[in-house]
A protein has these predicted regions:
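Short, hinge-like loop/turn segments at secondary-structure boundaries
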Residues: 96-100
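Short gly/pro/ser/thr-enriched loop/turn and capping motifs at secondary-structure boundaries
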Residues: 85-90
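Iron-sulfur (Fe-S) cluster-binding modules
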Residues: 1-55, 64-66, 70-78, 101-292
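Short glycine-/small-residue-rich Rossmann-like dinucleotide-binding loops
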Residues: 58-60, 84
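Short aromatic-enriched loop/helix-cap "lid" or pocket-rim segments at secondary-structure transitions
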Residues: 93
Length: 292
């Protein structure tokens, strides 16, 4: 029987919950694997040896995360990035838009503050720029999403148990959406609180929808109920960079509405989940290395 472990780094636990949301199917799955590590289900603190499949949730934020990640990699035959934080850095990666020291000063020395104004440094891990786990170890499979789809988690584990390569979506959310893709250019950009017209592409109506550049697999759940896709599953297979891809699309569709582009202002849209793994982040890291 294959040995399965779920290991958490910087995480809110949402991906772990997505695994548990298999409900009764989880019982069938646990009949095929031995769950040897899970902070929600197994009373065991240390990472065990001889892991066949390790699911890693959360991105890297501290030096402790790096050590834990490398330990998991050394003890695992197959390592899977579970969720968009592990795959791309996730929403915490937007903090990389700001200077790390300034961010720490704001949290610990800002006004008002509930701390003594001292940044912890003794006997605690160092805080670093947010990064996907692939920046430090080899990743064998990615299951993105915030959170990932429980069914996709199950299907991936079942395939790995059988020694098969799990199938991965090759299309975009737009391909899964009954409303899109857009057939005409939007006349203006709409706010998310404005009620959409039913049965019409949201991007076409002027809502900021990431569907054209986002990996399929969710069934376009958000656009189907009138909520624009926010790109939580990361870039579509053929998109080199999610933010650059959607910016390119918007230049074609609505150039006049985005001519006052601001990296810090718009990155929460273009790179909500993928800034830490973006081309821009690579350039920022290179610039920081040159300064040293």
């Amino acid at each position: 029987m294959k040995r399965l472990a779920i290991i958490s780094l910087m995480s809110d636990g949402g991906c772990h919950i997505a695994f548990l949301e298999l409900h009764e199917e989880l019982l069938h799955l646990l009949g095929q694997v031995e769950l040897i590590h899970s902070y929600m289900l197994v009373d065991r603190r240390e990472i065990p040896e001889h892991i066949d499949i390790a699911l890693i949730e959360g991105g890297v934020r501290t030096t402790h995360d790096i050590e834990l990640l490398k330990e998991a990699r050394s003890k695992s035959k197959i390592l899977v990035a579970l969720g968009s934080c592990a795959c791309f850095g996730g929403i915490p990666g937007l903090s990389n838009l700001y200077d790390l020291r300034a961010s720490l000063d704001y949290v610990y020395r800002g006004t008002p503050t509930t701390t003594e104004g001292v940044i912890p440094h003794e006997n605690v891990p160092s805080v670093i720029r947010v990064a996907p786990i692939s920046r430090f170890v080899q990743v064998d499979l990615q299951i993105p999403g915030c959170p990932p789809e429980p069914e996709e988690i199950k299907e991936a584990i079942v395939s790995l148990i059988k020694g098969e390569v799990p199938s991965q979506p090759s299309k975009t959310v737009c391909d899964e959406c009954e409303l899109g893709p857009p057939k005409e250019k939007p006349r203006r950009l709409r706010k998310i609180y404005e009620p959409p017209e039913p049965d019409r592409c949201l991007l076409e109506q002027g809502y900021f929808c990431m569907g054209p550049v986002t990996r399929a697999g969710c069934g376009a759940k958000c656009p189907r109920i009138g909520v624009p896709c926010d790109g939580c599953s990361g870039p579509a297979p053929k998109a080199l960079d999610q933010g650059i891809s959607i910016l390119d699309a918007l230049v074609t569709l609505a150039y006049k509405n985005i001519e006052n582009f601001s990296l810090k202002q718009h990155s929460a849209y273009f790179y909500r989940y993928t800034f830490a793994s973006s081309v821009i982040e690579d350039l920022l890291r290179k610039k920081l290395r040159e300064r040293r």
